[in-house]
Swiss-Prot record:
Gene3D superfamilies: Ribosomal protein S7 domain
Naturally occurring in which organism (per UniProt): Vitis vinifera
PANTHER family: RIBOSOMAL PROTEIN S7
GO molecular function: mRNA binding; rRNA binding; structural constituent of ribosome
Organism domain of life: Eukaryota
Protein name: Small ribosomal subunit protein uS7cz/uS7cy
Keyword S-adenosyl-L-methionine attached: no
Pfam families: Ribosomal_S7 (PF00177)
Protein purpose: One of the primary rRNA binding proteins, it binds directly to 16S rRNA where it nucleates assembly of the head domain of the 30S subunit.
Subunit structure as annotated in this protein's UniProt entry: Part of the 30S ribosomal subunit.
Keywords: Chloroplast, Plastid, Ribonucleoprotein, Ribosomal protein, RNA-binding, rRNA-binding
Listed InterPro entries: Ribosomal_uS7, Ribosomal_uS7_bac/org-type, Ribosomal_uS7_CS, Ribosomal_uS7_dom, Ribosomal_uS7_dom_sf
Amino acid sequence: MSRRGTAEEKTAKSDPIYRNRLVNMLVNRILKHGKKSLAYQIIYRSVKKIQQKTETNPLSVLRQAIRGVTPDIAVKARRVGGSTHQVPIEIGSTQGKALAIRWLLGASRKRPGRNMAFKLSSELVDAAKGSGDAIRKKEETHRMAEANRAFAHFR
């Protein structure tokens, strides 16, 4: 048994303008080559674009989009007796949010468009409405888990 103490789970800090943890999680995922100020610029521009498009609170649109994309269940590759099975596992809320943010950013990067702020705002608005690539990715993951339900006992 280990003598070391258990590490305390870190909580996500909130961003300086909106005081929102989700915004900060988005900033940290969009970050490339340590350019955090550029990541903040992209997020804040996309939030302004969401405000212009929907004429509602952009943070509620962001919350709704992330809630819509967050998966409840995922599949994990598990090797049993020489063959690899896709085993469905339940996902916690923190891990689900992280996956949702990753999928949203991936879908926005794939979109055709002018700049990242425009693409991200479009993807967030679509996800809040229940369409878009990120929502499709969630549904595909749920379908995979449902198809491999027979292997659930391999956890």
